[in-house]
Amino acid sequence: MVDEVEKPVSLEESKTNTREVEEEGEIVGESDDTMSSLGNPSMAMKHALEHSWTFWFDNPSGKSKQAAWGSSIRPIYTFSTVEDFWSVYNNIHHPSKLAVGADFHCFKNKIEPKWEDPVCANGGKWTMSFSRGKSDTCWLYTLLAMIGEQFDCGDEICGAVINVRVRQEKIALWTRNAANETAQVSIGKQWKEFLDYNDSVGFIFHDDAKKLDRAAKNRYSV
């Protein structure tokens, strides 16, 4: 892993410095036009990503035991350029600053971070665990690897989620075709390499998780 991430210069850096974060995962501007200004076509020389991506936030204060799973997840912002990614990323709380119980997602646009989404339905996820407050850098590197199309089997990737809990944080990388063992193992190995992560990581099918909950076993490990 490199010691420092070299961030592209944001063309809107002077604007984003004036934005405030109202709550975990939400950007608030001084006017209704704040968010739309991120995608202003008059801003020249932005670097387009291969896919558009959407940040989603699951606010722990909006959850209840009676509510259906995923009912409190809401989209935050969709970006499609390198510059807009940094504009958003630099103005939201990183995992170490999120409240316990929060889930923050980054998925390809039009894919919802839910098992029920048609693209995710037959998929699964790789998961890495970290001590509380220790996942910030690996979360960023995961995002950069995804949006930068660094995975050989990148078409298999749906998105990633960071789960913040009392004693630990977990980053999960969701993929679309769990039965494609070759692709999933390739993704798992590359992910570990990108993050310089030395512990074993496991892959669980969403279908197993739905049926067995925490009793679901890893189908693949790297």
UniProtKB/Swiss-Prot annotation:
According to the redox status, the Cys-120-Cys-158 disulfide bridge may have a role in regulating protein function by affecting its ability to bind capped mRNA. Residues 47-50, 57-93, 141-150 are annotated as: EIF4G-binding. Keywords: Cytoplasm, Disulfide bond, Host-virus interaction, Initiation factor, Nucleus, Plant defense, Protein biosynthesis, RNA-binding, Translation regulation. GO terms for molecular function: RNA 7-methylguanosine cap binding; RNA binding; translation initiation factor activity. Changing residue 214 to G: In strain: Petite Havana, allele 2. InterPro entries: TIF_eIF4e-like, TIF_eIF_4E, TIF_eIF_4E_CS. GO terms for biological process: defense response to virus; regulation of translation; translational initiation. It holds the Pfam family IF4E. SUPFAM superfamilies: eIF4e-like. PROSITE patterns: IF4E (PS00813). Displayed sequence is allele 1. Component of the protein complex eIF4F, which is involved in the recognition of the mRNA cap, ATP-dependent unwinding of 5'-terminal secondary structure and recruitment of mRNA to the ribosome. Recognizes and binds the 7-methylguanosine-containing mRNA cap during an early step in the initiation of protein synthesis and facilitates ribosome binding by inducing the unwinding of the mRNAs secondary structures. Key component of recessive resistance to potyviruses. (Microbial infection) Susceptibility host factor required for viral infection (e.g. potato virus Y (PVY) and pepper mottle virus (PepMoV)) by recruiting viral RNAs to the host ribosomal complex via an interaction with viral genome-linked protein (VPg). This is Eukaryotic translation initiation factor 4E-2. The lineage of its organism: Eukaryota, Viridiplantae, Streptophyta, Embryophyta, Tracheophyta.
